[in-house]
C-alpha cells in the first residue's frame, strides 16, 4: 500500500510517499481501507517534531473515513474516526490502510461524503470534549470562545448553539463569525472589559480558550463567580501568570483538555453524540478542499504556511490526479 512517511522531523519537505506492507489488526483492532483523511495543524506539529512521544519512522494523520476491511463483525461498513496517539506511536491515517482500536470507529453520517466525514475528527471531537464534557455548558448560559474563527472554535460555536447557549467570539480577526452574538477583536479591544460590557458586568459562565498564552488571564477575569475556563492550547509562551487571590475569591475553575489523551471509548461516545447533529444538519462543516494523495506534501505545505483556503482532505479515490475539487459543508 501507499503511505505518507517521515523518517526525520522537519518541514513538510521531509514527507515521502512510500510502498509499505498492509498492516494486520491485532486483538480489539480493525483494519480500515482509508477513502479520505484530513490534515490538521497538529499533523504539521507532529512532523516538525513538536510532540515528544513521536517515534520514527512514522505515518502521520489522525482523522479519516473509510471502509472496515478486517477485525470487526461489521466488515464493509462505512466508518469515520480518530484514534488516540494515531500518527504518534502508531502509524496514522495518511495511508491507504490504517489499523485503529475498533472501539473508536463510528458509522459515517449518511448525508456526508467520505471526504466530509474525514474532516469531522479532531476539531469536533476536541470541541465536544471541551464545551460539553469539560465545561458542561447548559441552555441559556453564555460562553466566550477565544479563537472562534479557527476550526475548533467554529466547531465549538456550533455545538454551543446546539446546546442552546449564547456565544461571544474572540480573536484577531475583524467582522462577524457565524453563530456568535458578538465578536471581540483582541488586537484592538480589551477582552475583559469587552466581555463585562456585553454581559452587563456579570461575566460569562464559561470560556473555551483555543489560544491560551496572553489571552489566558483576561479570559479568566471575564468569568462570572463560579465560572470555568477550558484551555486546549498555548500559543507562544507556555507559562502564564494570574492573580491567585482573585481566582479563589471568584470560585473560578480551570480545566485542561487534551484530545490525544482521550480513550477509544471516549472518542466513540463523542462520535455517537455528534452523528445526529450532522445527520439532521444542525452541525455543518466548513468548506473542504479535496487533494489527491499524491499531492499530500503540497497540502501539508499549504497548511503549514497558513495558505489553505479550506480544510485540506487527502483522497485515495481521485480520478485524474488534479487538484482543486472543493465541497461545501453539507454537499454529498
Regions found by a protein language model. Name each.
Residues 21-38, 48-86:
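Glycine-rich beta-strand-centered segment in the early N-terminal region that forms part
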Residues 118-189:
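Mid-domain Rossmann-like dinucleotide-binding core that forms the NAD(H)/NADP(H) cofactor-binding site
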Residues 191-201:
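Short amphipathic alpha-helix with an adjacent loop that forms part of the alpha/beta core around
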Residues 80, 207-208:
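N-terminal Rossmann-like NAD(P) cofactor-binding module of classical short-chain dehydrogenase/reductase
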Residues 163, 171, 214-282, 316-332:
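Glycine-rich phosphate-binding loop and adjacent beta-alpha segment
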Residues 70-72, 83, 102, 147, ...:
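Conserved "cap/hinge" positions at secondary-structure junctions
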Residues 81-147:
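NAD(P)H dinucleotide-binding glycine-rich loop of Rossmann-like/cofactor-binding domains
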